[in-house]
Amino acid sequence: LGMEGIMLVSALVTFVVDLKTGSKVLALIGAMMAAGALSGLHGFVCISLRGNQIASGLALALFGTGLSGLFGDTLIGSTVTSLNRIPIPGLELIPIFGSAFFNQDWLVYLSYVLVAGLWFMLFHTNWGLQIRSVGEAPNVCDALGLSVAKIRYLCVIFGGMLIGLGGAYFPLVLTSFWVDDLTAGRGWIAVALVIFAFWHPGKALWGAYLFGAAIAFQLQAQVMGLKIPSYILEMFPYLLTIVVLTVVTVRNRRAGQTFMPAALGLPFFRGEKH
């Protein structure tokens, strides 16, 4: 739930580092470090202190929004250069999907590698089995001698660093200047995307393109001059999010299935069964 705040802070750090150094790599590193630190704080509250994860996530979202707004005001009017697209010869010419998948910047291509790598790690390695077990049956992992807290900390921090990459994408690619609330609620859509994807990295990729298409439609409809009220276009991506989540939830309940990790949101106490 804190993704919106983490993305805003990482976007702010990216913009500042890029503005001061001109290095995209340093800007990305700074974004990932800032996001990892905020995620580590969230982990401390939820894992070590066993605090409420919903409350901590919402607090983090509000904190990040306020912090980026406070320090971002001094950046209004400043600009940075954007990453260039790198078309893949031949593949970019594929009808309909070619440009969307194969005429992108290197960060998008990196996301493909990350999705494939995370899928392989989660479902085909011992480390991935431990991660999934910590989410499903932490008491079993503890009985086997695994450190539930350590694994959860590593996952929270690493996940936060990936969120930082998402936040960095805004100033590095989507805009070359700073505006207040730069992410415009994309962090909340990302939360919905996790549920839509059933916590599966491969499905998350396709879900991201679905929600991305909704956002693109909103912008293209305005450019094309379609006679659709602007407020309807602005709410379209978020309306789609609500509809998709409703459909997914109803379908899963009727099928008697749940893809949510059994121990999600639950603090771990040694010796207690979830």
Cite the ranges covered by each PLM segment.
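Transmembrane helix-bundle core of multi-pass membrane transporters
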Residues: 65-124, 226-233, 258-274
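Helix-loop-helix "hairpin" substructures at the membrane interface of multi-pass membrane proteins
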Residues: 23, 100-178, 201-202, 206
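Hydrophobic core segments of alpha-helical transmembrane domains in multi-pass membrane transport
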Residues: 11-15, 65-66, 110-121, 159-167, ...
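Transmembrane alpha-helical segments in multi-pass inner-membrane proteins
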Residues: 174-238
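Alpha-helical transmembrane segments within multi-pass membrane transporters and channels
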Residues: 22-67, 215
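Membrane-interface helix caps of multi-pass small-molecule transporters
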Residues: 16, 20, 37-40, 44-48, ...
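Loop-to-transmembrane alpha-helix initiation sites
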Residues: 53-55, 81-86, 104-110, 152, ...
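Cytosolic-side transmembrane-helix boundaries in multi-pass membrane proteins
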Residues: 136-143, 147-150, 221-274
